[in-house]
Structures are given as C-alpha cells and as structure tokens.
Amino acid sequence: MTEHESLGLEQNQDGGDTYRHHNLSDGCISSVEDANEQPSSYEEESDDDMQYYERAIQEISSGDSYVCMICTVEMDYTCQMFACKRCYRVFDYGCIREWALKSTEKTVDRIWKCPNCYYVSKRVPVKNRPTCWCGKVVNPDPNPLDPNSCGQTCNASTCMHGCSKICHLGPHPECTRMVEIMCHCGKHSKSIFCYQSKVMKKNFNCQEVCGLPLSCSIHTCKKKCHPGLCGPCPEMIISKDSPKKQIKCYCGNHTRANIKCSETKFPKSGKSSKDENGNRWIGVFACADNRVVDYSCRKHSFIESCISPPTINGEKACPFLPSSLKTCPCGRTALEELTKPRKHCDDPIPTCDSRCGKPLKCGKHSCPFTCHDKACMEPCLQIDSVKCACEQSTFSVPCGFQGRPRCNIKCESLMSCRRHRCTDRCCSGRPSAIRRKKNLFRTQDLLDESLVEAKHICLKPCNLTLSCGIHKCQRKCHPGKCPPCLESDSNDLVCPCGNTVVPAPVRCGTKLPTCNHPCIKVVRGESTCGHKPMPHTCHSLDVSCPPCTETVFKPCKCGKKTKVRTVCFQTDVSCGIKCGIPLSYCYHTCQKTCHLPGNCQKVCKQTCGQKRLNCNHECPKPCHGKTECPDLPCATLVKIYCKCGRIKKSVTCGAKSDRVSVTESSVLDCNEECEALKRLKELKEAFGIKEETNNFTSNELDALKKLVSVATTFEELQLPFTEAALSVYSKQERWCSQIEAILNKLMDDKTRSSLHFKPMRPPQRHFIRELAKAYGLYSESQDREPMRSVFIKKEDNGASNKPVLSLAEAYPLYESFKQLQKERKAQEFQARTTAKLINFEVQDTEPKVEVAKKNGFLVQNLVAGNTAEDLRRFFEPHLKHTLVVNPQYLILDDGKTALVYPENYETASVNTERDMELLVGHFDFMAKEAFLADSISLCSTEEELERRLDTPVIQEDSPVMDNNT
C-alpha cells in the first residue's frame, strides 16, 4: 500500500500526477490497476499491512505528507480536524465547514456530501467547535503521538459494553467479551463473543420440541425450537360414533364429525343449549342457517340465526298482543284514541295521520310517510344539496344516490412536477390544490412534492435530456432541475494528439480540457492542398483544421483575368470588373461584377438614356427594352433667354412628336434695363473699360436702398439671406465669409454636386443651413453628437444658384433697416405718450402718511431644514418690485415660525401694506405647493417680535439675512 492510500487515491508508478480513485466503502482498498502490476512476492505485499486510516494518523503526526482534499495544504497534529463517518477521510475543520455551508445553500434538501466518498449528511459542523474522534472533548489539545485523540476510552455504543479502544479514527473493533444467549424455546444456552451475538442469537436453535401450552390451554406446541409465538392450536377434535357424542352447533340443527381446536368457540353466556323436548347439549360453533321461531300466539313468528341458547318455539311472547301494543306504529298516538280496543294479536293495527318520523338507515333523515305498519323508506329518496367532487358546483340528489355527483369543469391545477396540468374533469384534488396555492409562497415549498395532494402527483416519465446532452432523465416527472448524468465510460478520454488524457472512469458529458500542444496534422505536415498547414493547437475531431491561407494565383469567375491574387482556401475568386456584356433584351450592358458565364442580370434596372427623337435630351424612364420611348412631353428643365441674354427663365422642355422644344419656339422680351445695360456696355467698350462680373446693376442697388427706407418688415427687403444668417455675420464676419467662399466655389465647380462639412457645433451648423437657403441648396444634418455635421447638395432641377448679393453687400442694407426700425419705434412711443401739466401750490408742511398696521409676513409651520437663505430665494424675486424695502428674514427659536418684514417696518406706510396684501395669497399658495410651510399671513412685526422673542431687540447672531447679502 502506497503513501497516497490514506487519501483514497493511488499514484502512478512513474511519479506522475494522475490518480485513480479507490473503493473505501468496505474498509479495504481495491486498485484498478492490472494484476500484473501487483507485487509478486509475499514480502513486498506484507511490507506494511497498516490500514489506510491508521496510515492517515501516522502521516498527520509527521506533518509533511497528509493533504486536505479541499485546500490541498499539508496537515499536522496542531490542525483542527474532521473525519467522514463512512470513509474516515480527514479534512481541515474550517475547510469542511465552508464546504458544507456552500453545499446546503445550493440544495433543496439542505444536504452536503463528503468530497471523497459522497456520503450524504445534513449536519453541518458547528463553528469553532471541533471535537476529538470520539466526540467527548471540544477543541482537543494538540497530540503529536495520536493527533486529535483525547486519550480517553472511546466507549461508543456499538454494543452493551461499548468500544474499549482509546479515542481513535476509523471503524470500531469487534467486541470480544463473552455473553450468554438462549435458544428460541429457552431450554438451552451457550457462551459466545459479543460481536457474534447479533447473528448467533437469531440462528441458535436447539432442535427440540417447543412443548409450551397453546391458547386452548389443553394442547402443547409440537414445533421444533422456533422464534415468535406458537400460533393457533392445530389439533383436530374428532367425535365418537355415538350420536350423543357428536359435535353440535348452537341451535342443534347441524353436527360435525371433527373440528379444529382453534375453531371452537364456547358460548359467552356459559349456558347450554336446549330444545323443545328438554334435550341439552353444548354448542361449539355457529352454523349458517336461520330458524323460523313462533311466538307464543303461534300466529306470528320471527327469524333467528344460530345463537346460544336458541329460542324455543312458543316461549317468547307475541309483540302484537293487545296487552303489549299500546300505540300506533309511529308511537305518537295511543290505540285507545284511534279505534275500539283490540282483542287479538292478529287484529289490524290502526294508524294515525301523523308523520312516521322514524330514523332511516341513512342516519340523516326520518321517514316522511304517514304512520304505517310496514318497513320505512328504503333506500332514502329525500333530496340533499351535495357538492361535486371538485366543490365547484352544487347538485340536488337523492340521499340514497350511490357516489358523489360530478360536474364538467376541467381541473387545470399544476401537478407536482410544475410542468404539466391536471386534465381531469371534476377532480377531487382541486380544493386541496387551491388551498395549497394560497398557503405556499416560498420556492422551496413549491418544489416539495410531499406537500402536494396525492391526486396531483405526476407519474409521467421525465424524459428530459440531461446536462450531458445524450441521455434522458429516467426519473418520474419532477420539479426543479434534473440530476446530473451518472453514466460513465471505462475507457480513457484522449485528445487526437494523445498528449491530454482524462483517465477512466470518464463521466458522461465530460469534455476534453484545452490541449495546448500542436495539432497532429501540423506535426505530420498533412494538408489536402499540399501547402504547409497553418500552425494551430490540438482540437477535437469534429472541428476541422483552419483553412489554408497561403497566397496563390487563381483565375477569376468571368475569365477576364487568369491570375488573381487570393488565399488558397478561397474558391469564389472575383476580379472586381463589371461584366459589360450587352444584354439581349435591351440596349444596355450587364452591370454585375465578375460572375460565372451565363449569369448576367435577368432584369435591367438602369434608366433608358436613349436620345429622344424631338430633342437632344435622354429618356428618363426606366429601361423598357428595345421598344420605342413613350411619346410624352419632355420634362427636362431648360433655360430660355431674352435676345441680349440678360433675362433668363427655367421651364420644362416640352418637346413631343407634334411639338418642338421650348428653347426653339420661345424667346423672352428685353426690357428697359436690357437697353440701359447695352448702352453701358457700348460706352465701356468705347472708353476701354473692362467688364466687371457683378450681376447687380447700380439701378437695382438704388432701388434696394429706397426699399430699405420704406420697408416695415424684413421680408419686404427681399434680401437673398435670412435674418438669422445676417445676424451671425455681424458677430463672426471672418468665419462667415469663409463659409460663403466655400459655397461659391462649390457653385462654380460644375463637376461637383455635393459637399460635406466637418463636424461643428449646433450654432455653426444652423448658420450653414440658413446660408444654403440663399443658394437654393439642399441641406441636412447627419450623424450623432459630437460628430454631427452638415451635408449640402445641388438641386437636380437647376434651382441652385449663387445669390445676387454677397453677405458683405447685404449686411449694410440690413444694418440700415435695423437702425430705421429703432428710430420708428422711438417716434411711435413718443407719439403715444401724453404729458399733462398741472399747476398746484406748494405747501410748506410735509403731508402726513398713515403708518401700516400689518407690516410683515408670518410664516407658520415651517418645514424642517429650511434656512433664511431658502426664504430669501422664495420671497426676493417677488418683493424687489414692491415698496417692501430691504426685506429681512428671521427664523424664530422654535424653528417652525419665521418673519419676513421690511427694514423700515416701524415707519412703513399703508402703501407698503397694500402691496403686501396683494402678494400674501400668492405666497400662501406657492408655499404649500413647494412644501415650504403650511401657511403665510400678514402680521404686525412689533407684536410678533415682542411676543415670541425674549427681548424685542434683534440680536447680531440671529439668522437674519438682508436682501443685499
């Protein structure tokens, strides 16, 4: 036995780290190695025959070889220890307690298992209460000779004597004390070892006849020495040939030749039986016949079973005699009141008109018939209100109805598995299910099948796939998760390269750990394409090796290029060139990129583009094959000019089969400006002055200046720019001029149709979009903050043009307009102002002003936590426009009342009081809405200060804050 047997493990002979589990359940170790690896000589095998638990004590005593399975730390005699009750594996006390606590928290049954043998236990080791092996001493002293032993006698109650070994680890030894046992019949005894008594006591048989008296007290037991009671007497009682000696029943009508002793029953009354002739006998059994016995009147009779003693004919008085029967059958009325007195027993018995009322056999009702002399109602047909089995409906049924009525309501209660529902109709378990649903709230109780009524225990097979993904759960349908798969394989689980091994037994669902060694195909240099395989780690066989990424040349799909650089595994090689093959059904070519021959596009999605017959414009309709273009008016925008070319206008072409283009048929008329421009041009040519590129004439500028003087709104100025753009230009002239130059450059570039600005702040983006309106450009903001930017694009209809004025030219006009607007408003305000001059005499004495009676605000039930600063923020915005000069804010000592009053509250006038009266209701409503105080009212500041403060003088350290703080 090796050093690792104390752990329940066996180490490989080469000193590796692979261990195999040993079976410790029967106290011995069975190795899973082959028999050839066992020691061949007796000396090697008996070198150390010490048990594994004794070896564990020796290793713990040395302190350098016994390892705790949980923390993997070497244990010595100073450690606090805990041993499994089944396998006696020793663990560190703190480790096993933490193991048990975590396990019980995760299981419904609050159990934990030994890490070595999986022994199930519910008792968690108590904190800081480790004991010795026998459990007598808590926190035993360190013992280097016998670790964790208290040195006292074990005295475990394995037998009547107790274990005599010193406190020890492992199973208790067999008790060798001598005890005396008796045989089953108690006649003989013998002495044996105590440990043999449990088996020998059951098997000790003297083989002699028992001889104990039986229950009849006549015969004795003839069985051989046996355990338990002797049983009923098996002896047979045989009658003699004489008729007087035959065995009779109680009534004497039947006899037997023999009978078992145990079947005889003497009458409890102790009286002998007697017939009409005076013959007597003792009956010992009851026959199955019934006798008809006559009453003393010999007119009536009754039926009697076999009893002891039997009734003799004619001896029993007739119950129908007039002397015996005094009332009607129901017993409510005397016969004397109903009819003449009866003289004989066979005279009819009169009945009354009362209800019978005798209790019926059902025990719940009484007979409903009128007084009668025959049997009462049987079965009982009176109607009862009875609930059905599920207690959801009530039915009216006869009392004698066999079985409970049933409704047609489906149960639909959850079964014990909490997956299926009960499909029975009128289920008797539904009331219990409803009560269970109301009472159970914890998940632990909901999963407890013992709390579910028997009717709703699901007996279907679970049949769910286990965690291994292969096998099915064999349990009946159950709540919660299925148990782990317990199937295992006796073969080692080996990776393809053979370097990573999971030794047998391999539990079902176990996956190979990641193998960091190279793949076997990389080692061998195998690949399907012939290139060197890509370096990669070992993987399972169901995962293919990574594709080859060696650079190669392959022909493309369309065949235009025979050498396209690509990787080896790529089969779909494309040159990226458009096909360009003319399509058979239209005038266009295939626009698909490199594709296989014959896979050209089936539907052409291009614009027709053919030249129209009546103008040079292209057909804008979608491709319509080789059919003629539709004869519709051309919708292309064209420009028509006057003769001198100054005036232009954008119109649709309108060319058609019966109509020429508008450019050929329409010419705009020149106006006076055209003539003036023509003369100006001739003068400039005569004087040698070069032509300036300014589209605005001096007359138009003069007209704009005149318009500024008469315009009343910005729209009447007819400037190309918006007011927002000109306002920004007035503040950021340089930056706005740069943006204007960028847009002018875009308009001059005929090859470019759009522009994307870099990300900017919102005000800058807004200016660009406002400026784009003057150019007739489409604009939009794109992306999210903070990368949001502006995108502008020329309109397709030719509406995008440079404005006739620049920002620099338009801004002076806008500035003049703003100045004129200010002057007009000042004049209008002065015109609406009326001055009234009144002459009055100046008095030498100053007028008397009435002093206010209420000169402050009283804040009551101030919410805790508010300060004078909070009061100032609440009142100041509303008081600064009133006559309340420099308001003061004072919170009184109780903390629930505050005063707000003007600094000159002693001389405040009634005008100040009027202002405060106008605001007090407003303050009261706002204080309640803001949860500042319960109410605000007017008060006399002098009276409140005198009544609430110790002195009327405001102290310097009081919480007062003026309006200028």
From Swiss-Prot:
Pfam families: R3H (PF01424), zf-NF-X1 (PF01422). GO terms for molecular function: DNA-binding transcription factor activity, RNA polymerase II-specific; RNA polymerase II transcription regulatory region sequence-specific DNA binding; zinc ion binding. Keywords: Cytoplasm, Metal-binding, Nucleus, Phosphoprotein, Repeat, Transcription, Transcription regulation, Zinc, Zinc-finger. A zinc finger (NF-X1-type) spans 159-177, 216-235, 362-382, 468-487, 586-606. The modification Phosphothreonine is found at T951. Present with 589 molecules/cell in log phase SD medium. May play a role in transcription regulation. Belongs to the NFX1 family. This is FKBP12-associated protein 1. The gene is FAP1.
